[in-house]
């Protein structure tokens, strides 16, 4: 039985859970899972890197199967951008592996510290949803272990119904052992960022439609506390891969880490209102453009360790 706590990023319940390494299981047999976990009710659920919100990957009476130990990238074709890796490989590992060859994840969420299996199980979306769809559209095949069958190789041609159900299946269709995905060809990882400050919700909708047409990536921050004429004010941030720039795929180290869980959240009431006001005015009126590192554009919160506290 493992010592670390296995919990979701939103931390809805913090209790110790049984967990074993998936690499220790040659086959997904309930009796073997129970024996290695030292108990449990016979149920088991895959666990990625604990970056999901809500109560995903909570199986208090059963056993979690940790997909990270021993996870590695098996193959990458720099000509076609097709990669095969274990489910426990992190997006950060994939980026470092493929960026020098001019490739990037076709869909990525707001953190690089998710697993490949977790991305499939949640069918994640990113800032380019309007162009690339969800992550599942880029999955070519899945190697799936089930307790009631032999290991299955699933794709749009082989076991298509199970393949479709596993994408966004939250781990309930079986244990994803590995997956093959397609990547996005990019000139660099540096992002040409365009930020437009808007005064109200009506302005946002007009800007957002234009941004989706012109840019690969688009996302907005809205001041949810603003009222009256300022209702819905915020920033629209759009981006595209710069023609020249960084291609190492190495993100910067965190600036700081939250050491403790405060008894009361500091982001509430007047403090949150003051933060929103300052953040809104951080962007100059009108539109500004600049070049930014990929991790600053895609993963700004990754620079604050344990910010979920």
Regions found by a protein language model. Name each.
Residues 1-309:
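Noncatalytic alpha-helical scaffold of FAD-dependent oxidoreductases
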């Amino acid at each position: 039985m493992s010592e670390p706590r296995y919990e979701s990023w939103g931390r809805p319940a913090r209790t110790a859970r049984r967990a074993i390494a998936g690499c220790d299981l040659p086959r997904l047999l309930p009796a073997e899972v129970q024996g290695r976990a030292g108990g449990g009710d016979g149920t088991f659920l895959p666990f990625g890197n604990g970056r999901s919100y809500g109560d995903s990957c909570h199986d208090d009476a059963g056993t979690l199967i940790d997909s990270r130990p021993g996870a590695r990238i098996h193959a990458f074709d720099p000509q076609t951008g097709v990669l095969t890796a274990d489910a426990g490989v992190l997006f950060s590992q994939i980026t470092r592996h493929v960026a020098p060859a001019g490739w990037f994840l076709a869909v990525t969420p707001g953190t690089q510290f998710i697993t490949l299996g977790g991305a499939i199980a949640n069918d994640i979306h990113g800032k380019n949803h309007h162009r690339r769809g969800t992550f599942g559209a880029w999955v070519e095949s899945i190697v799936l272990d089930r307790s009631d069958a032999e290991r299955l190789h699933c794709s749009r041609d082989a076991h298509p119904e199970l393949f479709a159900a596993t994408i966004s299946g939250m781990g309930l269709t079986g244990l994803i052992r590995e997956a093959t995905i397609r990547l996005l060809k990019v000139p660099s990882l540096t992002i040409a960022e365009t930020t437009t400050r808007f005064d109200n919700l009506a302005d946002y909708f007009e800007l957002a439609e234009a941004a989706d047409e012109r840019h690969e990536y688009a996302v907005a921050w809205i001041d949810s506390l603003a009222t009256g004429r300022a209702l819905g004010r915020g920033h629209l941030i759009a981006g595209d891969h710069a023609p020249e720039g960084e291609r190492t795929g190495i993100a910067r180290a965190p600036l700081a880490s939250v050491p403790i869980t405060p008894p009361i959240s500091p982001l509430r009431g007047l403090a949150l209102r003051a933060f929103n006001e300052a953040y809104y005015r951080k962007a100059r009126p009108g539109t500004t453009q600049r070049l930014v590192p990929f991790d600053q554009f895609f993963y700004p919160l990754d620079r604050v360790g344990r910010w979920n506290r």
